């Protein structure tokens, strides 16, 4: 089984060093996506322009994509909403992740980058099954994580890992 990496960070220079592709997340939406070098050189949104200006981008870090295109992770219209009102009387939904779609192929590294509070951690928790979703789908190794049984999900989880930014701070 080939590997792929999903890097979730607010540090654009680190994403540039490790990733082939990038998706810029803001208020739960992917607002810009593509080849990392193209996105960095020609940012289309204000958020991306600010991220590029805020950090030093390391040259010579572009990764070569492996020719074999096995899809390992497919996320389609994923939604993670939190009810922050007094349910059921006054529902107000915070759309932490809203209609997020991307694919990750064998040999690729995709960076999810955005400012604090934009939905990166919520997306990570949803992808690992630690947070329920409000809609959309997550396919990992061709299996829909929201519809498979507990035993199959447990077997798939051996291939999923979170590496925290500062492991000692998580204890």
Regions found by a protein language model. Give the residues of each.
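A short, surface-exposed alpha-helical micro-motif characterized by mixed small hydrophobic
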Residues: 15-17
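Conserved ABC transporter NBD signature motif
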Residues: 136-144, 156
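Helix-to-loop junction immediately C-terminal to a conserved catalytic motif
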Residues: 128
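C-terminal boundary and immediately downstream tail of ABC-type ATPase nucleotide-binding domains
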Residues: 40-69
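The feature captures the beta-strand-to-loop junction immediately N-terminal to the Walker
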Residues: 113-114
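ABC ATPase "signature
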Residues: 33-34, 42
């Amino acid at each position: 089984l080939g590997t792929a990496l999903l890097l979730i960070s607010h540090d654009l220079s680190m994403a540039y060093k490790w990733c082939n592709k990038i998706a810029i997340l803001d208020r739960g939406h992917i607002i810009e996506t593509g080849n990392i070098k193209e996105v960095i050189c020609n940012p289309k949104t204000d958020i991306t322009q600010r991220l590029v200006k805020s950090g030093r981008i390391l040259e010579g870090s572009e990764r070569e994509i492996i020719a074999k295109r096995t899809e390992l992770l497919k996320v389609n219209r994923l939604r993670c909403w939190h009810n922050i009102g007094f349910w059921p009387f006054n529902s107000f939904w915070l759309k932490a992740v809203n209609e997020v779609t991307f694919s990750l192929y064998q040999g690729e590294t995709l960076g999810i980058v955005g400012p604090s509070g934009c939905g990166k951690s919520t997306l990570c928790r949803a992808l690992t099954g630690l947070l329920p979703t409000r809609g959309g789908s997550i396919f990992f190794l061709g299996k829909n994580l929201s519809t498979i049984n507990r035993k199959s999900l447990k077997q798939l989880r051996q291939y999923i890992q979170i590496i925290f930014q500062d492991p000692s701070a998580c204890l």
